[in-house]
Amino acid sequence: MHEASLAGGILKLVEDAARREAFQRVTVLRLEVGQLAGVELRALKFALEAIAPGTALDGARLEFEEPAGQAWCMACSQTVPLAARGMACTGCGSYQLQPTGGTELRVMDMLVADE
């Protein structure tokens, strides 16, 4: 479950920001996790909630945005939806696809408190 290590990295980003910006805790953390990022959202949420106690994330509401997968087909030169890696182009059936969207994994923003 690599989501646990991803959660650790996210916590490190938050803790570093808390030290740098002098805030005590995060009340809302918004993450963008694309459909093609290879991340199981439920597992990531579980991992973040498991490591949050005693940190700046303790009690934070976690919000996720999940951008749809999208790819450029090199065979038919079209942008097509892509539900999962390894799928064929919905236009021509080719497998020569270059993902162009839905691969994101990033902290979008956070609402913080100084208390």
UniProtKB/Swiss-Prot annotation:
UniProt GO MF annotations: nickel cation binding; zinc ion binding
Q: Which UniProt keywords apply?
A: Metal-binding, Nickel, Zinc
Q: Which residues bind Ni(2+)?
A: H2
| Alphabetical list of InterPro entries matching this protein | Hydgase_Ni_incorp_HypA/HybF_CS, HypA/HybF
> PROSITE patterns of this UniProt entry?
HYPA
Keyword Repeat among UniProt keywords: no
User: Where does this protein hold Zn(2+)?
Assistant: C73, C76, C89, C92
**Pfam families, alphabetized:** HypA (PF01155)
- Zinc listed as a keyword: yes
* A Gene Ontology biological process term: protein maturation
Q: What's this protein's family per the entry?
A: Belongs to the HypA/HybF family.
Q: What does this protein do?
A: Involved in the maturation of [NiFe] hydrogenases. Required for nickel insertion into the metal center of the hydrogenase.
- Protein name per the record: Hydrogenase maturation factor HypA
Q: Which organism is it from?
A: Polaromonas naphthalenivorans (strain CJ2)
Please name the taxonomic classification of the source.
Answer: Bacteria, Pseudomonadati, Pseudomonadota, Betaproteobacteria, Burkholderiales
